[in-house]
């Protein structure tokens, strides 16, 4: 390789290096505008309120006392079972962590 080739290569790399340095923009941490956050919050809360209202209307429209009583009974039985199984699981975990004495 000749010195001309190396000189040309160095010049090209130098120019490319300056181009890359010139292309870098100072990074600015742009904070999202409070107006945008408030708009998003308001839209989400309006969606949530409309979903709650629709669910309430559906519940009132299809309310049956017999079904409600069955659901309450099912809930009480399932919570009792879960508390029992949670106690068993807790005892097992504690015995594994404590080890044999």
Curated annotation (Swiss-Prot):
Q: Which UniProt keyword terms apply here? A: Chylomicron, Glycoprotein, HDL, LDL, Lipid degradation, Lipid metabolism, Lipid transport, Secreted, Sialic acid, Signal, Transport, VLDL
> InterPro entries, alphabetically?
Apo-CII (IPR008019), ApoC-II_dom_sf (IPR023121)
A GO-annotated cellular component = chylomicron
Provide one Gene Ontology biological process annotation: lipid transport
From which domain of life does this come? Eukaryota
GO MF term set: phospholipase activator activity; phospholipase binding
Q: Give the span(s) annotated as Lipoprotein lipase cofactor.
A: 78-101
Instruction: Provide the propeptide boundaries.
Output: 23-28
Signal sequence residues: 1-17
Q: Where in the cell is it found?
A: Secreted
Post-translational modification here is noted as: Proapolipoprotein C-II is synthesized as a sialic acid containing glycoprotein which is subsequently desialylated prior to its proteolytic processing. Proapolipoprotein C-II, the major form found in plasma undergoes proteolytic cleavage of its N-terminal hexapeptide to generate apolipoprotein C-II, which occurs as the minor form in plasma.
Region (Lipid binding) location: 66-74
The UniProt entry's sequence similarity note says: Belongs to the apolipoprotein C2 family.
Question: What does the UniProt record say this protein does?
Answer: Component of chylomicrons, very low-density lipoproteins (VLDL), low-density lipoproteins (LDL), and high-density lipoproteins (HDL) in plasma. Plays an important role in lipoprotein metabolism as an activator of lipoprotein lipase. Both proapolipoprotein C-II and apolipoprotein C-II can activate lipoprotein lipase.
Give the protein's recorded name: Apolipoprotein C-II
- Which organism encodes this protein? Theropithecus gelada (Gelada baboon)
Q: What is the lineage of its organism?
A: Eukaryota, Metazoa, Chordata, Craniata, Vertebrata
């Amino acid at each position: 390789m000749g010195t001309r080739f190396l000189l040309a290569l160095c010049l090209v790399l130098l120019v490319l290096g300056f181009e890359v340095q010139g292309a870098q923009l100072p990074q600015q941490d742009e904070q999202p505008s409070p107006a945008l956050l408030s708009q998003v919050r308001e839209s989400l809360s309006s969606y949530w309120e409309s979903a709650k209202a629709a669910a309430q209307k559906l519940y009132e429209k299809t309310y049956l006392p017999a079904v409600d009583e069955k659901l309450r009974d099912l809930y009480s039985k399932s919570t009792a079972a879960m508390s029992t199984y949670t106690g068993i699981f807790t005892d097992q975990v504690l015995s594994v962590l404590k080890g044999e004495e």
